[in-house]
Each structure stands twice: as C-alpha cells, then as structure tokens.
Amino acid sequence: LARNVEIFRGEHLAHSSPERLVAQCWDLAGLDRRYAAFIARWSREFEHCNQCGMTGARAGIHKPCTAPADCFRRRFLLVHEYRAFPLEDPLLPGPLLPAGWTGKAAARLFETYHDALAGPAERFVADVCAEGDEIVAAA
C-alpha cells in the first residue's frame, strides 16, 4: 500500500472559519430545499405503494399501483430526479451542515424505495425483452 498511496495532512491557518468557507463555496440552503422537495414528493408515493401492497408486489401479487410497468416507471423517475444530488452534495461532515439537514434522509428514502421497486421493475424489463425476442424470432 505504501508504494501506491501518499498521505497529506492540512491545516487551515487564517482568514475565515470553516463555516464561512463552506457558505462561500456551496449553496447548502438551496440544496437542502431540493432534498426536502424530493422527500415530500417521493415519501408520499412510497407510503402509498406500501399501503396498497408493495410487499405483495415483491412476492408476485400485483395491485394496480405496484404492477411491474408502474414500478418500472416510478423507479425510472425516482432515479432521474435523485441522480443530480450526488454530483451537487459536497458530503461535508455533520458539524458543517445546516441544522436539520435533509440529505441523509433523502438518500435513505431513495435507497429504500429504489430497492422496493427493483423486483417488479426488473420483471417488467425482462418481460419486454422476452417479448422483443419472440417478435424477432417470428420475423
């Protein structure tokens, strides 16, 4: 490991506090508002799917809101909306984040809902691909 790694230690010596430097470099309040909007939108959908049988959908019992095509659509939109956050979030340590920071809650919601939608969404893709194979074979 020592042949491939360099280790540095830095110390901020003057002119501003870490909090002030963070405020100059990132719009954390704006990012936090976008995280909160993401949570508001997707937590309602996640709860709705849980109430109407998301766990049943994972077991193969599809209710209207958890049909494979709908799960694929929801998962696609969820990923599309969330994917900008990892590029924008500086992943600062807790003491440098605003009080009530919603970034971690948004990440947990994304991971939980994304995983819950996986089974039915992936079945939908497999079914569509199989149908395409049948069409090609018949041509």
Regions found by a protein language model. Give the residues of each.
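Long, contiguous binding/interaction regions
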Residues: 1-139
